[in-house]
Amino acid sequence: TRLVGSEMCIRDRATIDVEGTVKPEERAPHGFEIRLDKIKVLSEPAAPMPLAISKWKLNTSLEANLNNRAIALRNVRERAKFRIQEGVVRGFRDFLYSQGFTEIHTPKIGAKSAEGGANLFRLEYFHRPAVLQQSPQFYKQMMVGVFDRVFETAPVFRAEKHNTKRHLNEYTSLDFEMGYIDGFEDIMAMETGFLQYMIALLKKDYAEELRLLGVTLPNVDKIPTVRFCLLYTSPSP
């Protein structure tokens, strides 16, 4: 343990134990700083960091980021993305629990796809053909007869070649199914309620992460419903 003021060299990313007084500081990232009295080095890195993760942005190539992923994820902005992901899933779960839904967990390996189509990841399952599931749709429909309202948060897999940011081969799907509805408007109302709850939760509990990523969430008071008129034409004589 060294007293502050004595000569001491601390390497970047060393693990330290400090004693001091917490003081407000507007210029600090979290609004406060510690005025040190004592500091103790618990451990030092075995080698210099391959990335400057203490910077605001990594400013590295995608290849360098992925090759050093375990280290790159320690960057404050990289971490913030996973916190936002947590907030979205948390909001989905909390809202549906409040609406009387039951969470289910369905198989992801099956003999056939739940949605049909040919874009499947195929594999061998103990010498028998199988596929990775594209959707929990069949399982949700079965469980609605058990619990009336069910939801799942789980990965789905789609073997589709793409070149856009809006298509992924594997992603976390937020699915729900509900019985005893009068029409699709009931589904839209549930989705609107979730979006309102989730956005309010992110603004409240994940404000720092949103600030780090430069994200401004919209206000979702009411989502407009676009209706189409059905036109009837008499058959030609």
Name the predicted role of every residue range:
Residues 87, 91, 190-197:
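Long, highly charged amphipathic alpha-helices
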Residues 6-7, 11-181:
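Class II aminoacyl-tRNA synthetase-like tRNA-binding/catalytic domains
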